[in-house]
């Protein structure tokens, strides 16, 4: 058997040792590049240049370093079509430059995990769900903080609060308990009664304005929930 196990701790170290000569070669040629272990992007000004550089660098890797280039994963593409280390790229017309952001696949993966952590049938307390959500949020933001994602954080915040409202509404269980808790949160008795006895599905009830008022951002923050937007704004590298 040849090579090292994929995903092992040793693989990135060995890749850096082997590809150090590649870094020197690309620097000597004056190329703009980013490399993490064996994952590399080379940036040039035109498609013609990109095809030429890809041929030459692939030849250098195979002939000088004795490594095999995986051509199924190697391609020439515009920045908008790239996914690199979980990031995607877009052109900011106001700044007139390309910027990084979480790739759509990374966002979808986050949403899937967030949905799992806010599943109403998961038999743990809501405080436990918030704790797990906070771990997810902090880890995700700390990784992607170099990207531009204020609007995305705002959208995800709204989605998280909505799903937590559904968890809380289910926890209240009976109409009497729901009326009592809504009134504690400042909802008048008539509105609380109508909301509690609406008979609608939880997903619909928790979209209503009364629920947005009763279980708002401030109250969920007091409950311990970390705001993605606030956490990102405090740590944003490009803001």
Task: Say what each PLM segment does.
Residues 1-239:
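Non-catalytic terminal/accessory segments
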